[in-house]
């Protein structure tokens, strides 16, 4: 194979996924490893190198893109990621460059998703949009005039830690009331136990030992009144917050990414409704809510690899 390829790497607290794709988003190889099996980042880099070498694609790799928690674009480091076994500041981009001898770009996973949408997905026709990643937590990547906003230190876009409820739910960051404690898979599950509802005692949710967000959405579709209230509340918190975010970002669209976003069009429609109700008049009816077009199974690798093509363009 003589086609130029980018190696995309998504570092997760549980699993890390890596794969090879071309500038059109065609995936040629993908594999997942258990992150915690590697006591040091050097050992993980060695593993990925040997796998890419073994499948015969090493000469085709023209660059490496990495999406990682607390990833800093400017320094190429992972900084104090709470969900990783490796502590402190990890110079991961430098480790990959030393091993592979190619340019390596690192940023956080939400920023990688935003670039992925711009290169391959729902943001291909947009120059100003915000990707909202809805997973265990909530992240965001802000694209303005076709460029990702990193801020002065590489950590712009921590939208999940905007406080939406004064003295609200305790967040993993140590603060209270952060958006991701309400709008995320974890936030949806917390609402089962924390929302005061006259319908809670008759809901099937109460009988679930370890409920998941996907079950809440499914029960809402089936008409469970308490589940409907939870989804409505989640959409309202997000919609109101997006209306505030619009005041200083003024995007053409918000692109919802992740499991919650893929739960069905009704959630996005609810978010849109609450956002419109809360928007200033100058922004009304101007902003779209779109669903990610990146295939959920390959989204992490595509997002990471897109960093390479964006840098080379």
For the regions a language model picked out, list residue spans one by one:
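ATP-binding/phosphotransfer module of carbohydrate and carboxylate kinases, centering on a glycine-rich
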Residues: 1-63, 73-77, 93-102, 119-126, ...
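A generic structural motif
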Residues: 33-34, 85, 155
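A charged helix-plus-loop insertion that forms the helical arch/lid used to bind
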Residues: 77-89
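Glycine-rich phosphate-binding loop of actin/hexokinase-like ATP-binding domains
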Residues: 126-182
């Amino acid at each position: 194979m003589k086609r130029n390829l980018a190696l995309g790497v998504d570092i997760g607290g549980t699993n890390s996924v890596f794969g090879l794709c071309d500038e059109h988003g065609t995936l040629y190889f993908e594999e997942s490893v258990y992150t915690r099996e590697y006591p040091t980042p050097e050992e993980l880099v060695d593993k990925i190198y040997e796998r890419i070498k073994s499948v015969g694609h090493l000469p085709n790799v023209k660059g490496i893109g990495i999406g990682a928690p607390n990833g800093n674009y400017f320094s190429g480091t992972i900084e104090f990621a709470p969900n990783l076994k490796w502590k402190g500041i990890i110079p991961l981009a430098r480790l990959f460059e030393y091993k592979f001898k190619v340019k390596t770009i690192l940023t956080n996973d939400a920023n990688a998703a935003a670039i992925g949408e711009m290169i391959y997905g729902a943001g291909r026709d947009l120059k100003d949009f915000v990707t909202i990643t809805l997973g265990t937590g909530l992240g965001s990547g802000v694209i303005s005039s076709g460029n990702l906003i990193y801020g002065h230190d590489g950590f712009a876009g921590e939208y999940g830690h905007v406080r939406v409820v004064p003295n609200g739910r305790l967040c993993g960051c140590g603060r209270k009331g952060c958006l991701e404690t309400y709008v995320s898979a974890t936030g949806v599950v917390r609402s089962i136990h924390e929302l005061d509802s006259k319908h809670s005692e008759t809901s099937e949710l109460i009988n679930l030992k370890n409920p998941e967000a996907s079950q809440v959405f499914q029960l809402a579709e089936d008409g469970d009144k308490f589940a409907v209230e939870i989804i409505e509340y989640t959409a309202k918190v997000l919609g109101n917050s997006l209306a505030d975010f619009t005041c200083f970002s003024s995007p053409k669209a918000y692109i919802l990414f992740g499991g919650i976003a893929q739960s069905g069009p009704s959630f996005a429609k609810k978010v849109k409704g609450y956002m419109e109700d809360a928007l200033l008049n100058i922004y009304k009816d101007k902003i779209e809510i779109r669903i990610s077009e990146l295939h959920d199974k390959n989204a992490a690798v595509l997002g990471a690899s897109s960093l390479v093509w964006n840098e080379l363009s």
